[in-house]
Design a protein with these regions (language model features):
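A charge-rich, low-complexity, intrinsically flexible signal that marks solvent-exposed coils, linkers
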Residues: 1-160
Length: 160
């Protein structure tokens, strides 16, 4: 179950009118931290992200079910929504703790997350990435906008 702090951050994001994916980002960050500390486990980076998104759905974030994935995955996402706010059994909890001890933490290293972010970005079109960057720039203040512009200029120079 996600921490109260994480739920509060997500609620704050919702109150500020941020998108459900931004709200869910809080849960993904929380999940990554838990895996790094050895509280949770994931076999790969995508799984770590999926667990965070699943927790977000359980906490009531209005995330749509994943586009890619069969009916099984969509059914599981629907179950997560239905399980929101229900307690977890002790037996399940004990089994989970035992299983977590065998899981690696390298799946959420900065290198692994960087690799995952790059591969996810490659799947999007250039215009889609550009549109997302412009939207992000609109939501930033002047200082952050300036930093983003400098970073964009560096990237353009590097890619020439």
């Amino acid at each position: 179950m996600p921490d109260k702090q994480t739920i509060d951050k997500a609620k704050k994001d919702a109150a500020e009118g941020k998108s459900p994916s931004t709200q869910a980002g809080e849960f993904v960050h929380d999940e990554i931290e838990k895996i790094r500390q050895g509280e949770h486990g994931a076999r790969n980076t995508k799984q770590a992200i999926a667990i965070g998104l699943s927790e977000a759905r359980r906490a009531g974030v209005k995330l749509p079910p994943p586009k890619s994935g069969g009916p099984e995955l969509k059914k599981k996402a629907k179950q997560d929504e239905e399980r929101a706010g229900k307690p977890v059994s002790q037996t399940r909890s004990r089994a989970r703790r035992k299983a977590v001890k065998k899981e690696p933490t390298s799946t959420v290293s900065s290198e692994a997350l960087s690799k995952q972010a790059k591969s996810a970005a490659k799947q999007r079109s250039a215009s889609d990435r550009s549109k997302a960057a412009k939207k992000a720039a609109r939501t930033k203040g002047p200082k952050e906008r300036s930093q983003a512009a400098k970073k964009a200029a560096r990237t353009r120079a590097k890619n020439k």
